[in-house]
Amino acid sequence: MLLVDVAGASADVAASSARLAKIARIAELLRRAGREDVAIVVSWLSGELTQRQIGVGWASLRSVPAAAAEPTLTVAEVERRFGEIGATAGRGSQARRAQLLADLFSAATDVEQTFLRRLLTGELRQGALVGVMADAVAKAADLPAATVRRAAMLGGDLPAVAAAALTDGDAGLAQFTLQAGKAVGPMLAQTAADVTDALDRLGGTAMFEAKLDGARVQIHRRGDSVSIFTRSLDDVTARLPEVVEATLALPVTDLIADAEAIALRPDGRPHRFQVTASRFGRRGGTSDTASNPLSVFFFDLLHVDGVDLLDAPAHERIARLDAVTPDSQRVDRLVTSDPGAAQEFFDRTLAAGHEGVMAKSTVAPYEAGRRGAGWLKVKPVHTLDLVVLAVEWGSGRRSGKLSNIHLGARDPGTGGFVMLGKTFKGMTDEMLAWQTRRFLDLADGDATDHYVVKVRPEQVVEIAFDGLQTSTRYPGGMALRFARVVRYRDDKAATDADTIDTVREIYERGN
């Protein structure tokens, strides 16, 4: 299959707001893909490289060669080149990687260059989410969507499921079963406004758990063998020996469990998320165990000693979890129908330094790989009034509109602004239309000449965010987590915006 076919389908999917149209377009593409290309195409259209990371970002793509006149690149050839770029290391690797990248882009047409750029920078915003992609695979293979979704849930690898479905149909999907040692797509949570909202949505009674600001891990044990996977299903077993040790101490033979790994201070309060995250990076590992040990807290059980629990109600899974794990290695928990008791638990959890609570149905099954209605997260909302420093032209449905806004806090010391991140979340169609007009008026230079449009720092926007994290990308050393637009504040001048000192105060008190 030619790359131009994938790029064209991606553009069509991005331009459509209709779910069924997206599914039909992707399914049509998958039917035409060769069996060796299916998994690659599904990965790319899901916004992922099969290699995950190959060391290419926006900085590497600021200047690319002129586009080719005719499409010649195949999916297999581009995949091979991605692998070669990712494998480039050692002395002179930066120059070699740049040359390989230039060679690739010089062979790509304009539409292919656009697709490659967005794929490599994680900006492939086309609405081909996992649910859409799974349904497209089902349509292409003429299989029930539920069958494909369950295989993807158990296999934790939709591209592999797609390849099996398109090649061998039902028989191909039979290989995807729950097995210790084989990562499963984790169940995800929806959001509730507060604990009362959570209780209402869960039928009046809920199990509330402390939501730790650590790293979610899926722990597998087969006899004396332990495997640990991240939320994105990366194998990090070798980096977490203390979690392996804790798992081997449990009185079980086989197990698949959901847990949180977190770095704690001597007083039991959590370190900042970055301290925990440092153990999961490329440079993290066993050498950090003594200075930065992780504690493990289990919160769900998917399988134990030959018994699959995915379809069991939550109260049964938790009862089995409690039977095989010590109190000290389980998250704090409260089952209640009393909003007052739930709020007290929420407040106590925040006071302990954690980021919020999870509210869970006591009767819901474990919906692996899905954002199930049986799990709701409740977190405090922070807001800041920040100033827009620049805006990026959108793509897909947002093509022709100024979309992603760069956010800065006021610096009283210099009179300037310190960038804290960027977001396009929370924007309605009406807001996009308004801000396009507004920022074109504020543009500092030719707004059509660059992907990023610098603007005069005059527009104040109210931003909600979940917290702050350490960042080397921005000069203030901090970045907003999960920022989204609440509203534009035309009643405020840039001099009324929150200062970088205010942001630091939030950061220092643990968000």
Swiss-Prot record:
- Catalytic activity, as annotated: ATP + (deoxyribonucleotide)n-3'-hydroxyl + 5'-phospho-(deoxyribonucleotide)m = (deoxyribonucleotide)n+m + AMP + diphosphate
**Molecular-function GO term, any one:** DNA ligase (ATP) activity
Q: Name the keywords, alphabetized.
A: ATP-binding, Cell cycle, Cell division, DNA damage, DNA recombination, DNA repair, DNA replication, Ligase, Magnesium, Metal-binding, Nucleotide-binding
What's the EC number here?
6.5.1.1
InterPro entries the UniProt entry points to: ATP-dep_DNA_ligase, DNA_ligae_ATP-dep_bac/arc, DNA_ligase_ATP-dep, DNA_ligase_ATP-dep_C, DNA_ligase_ATP-dep_cent, DNA_ligase_ATP-dep_CS, DNA_ligase_ATP-dep_N, DNA_ligase_N_sf
Gene Ontology terms: biological process: cell division; DNA biosynthetic process; DNA recombination; DNA repair; DNA replication
Where, by residue number, does ATP bind? E209, R216, R231, E260, F299, R371, K377
Instruction: Tell me which family the UniProt entry assigns to this protein.
Output: Belongs to the ATP-dependent DNA ligase family.
Under which name does UniProt file this protein? Probable DNA ligase
Record organism: Mycolicibacterium gilvum (strain PYR-GCK) (Mycobacterium gilvum (strain PYR-GCK))
Lineage, uppermost ranks? Bacteria, Bacillati, Actinomycetota, Actinomycetes, Mycobacteriales
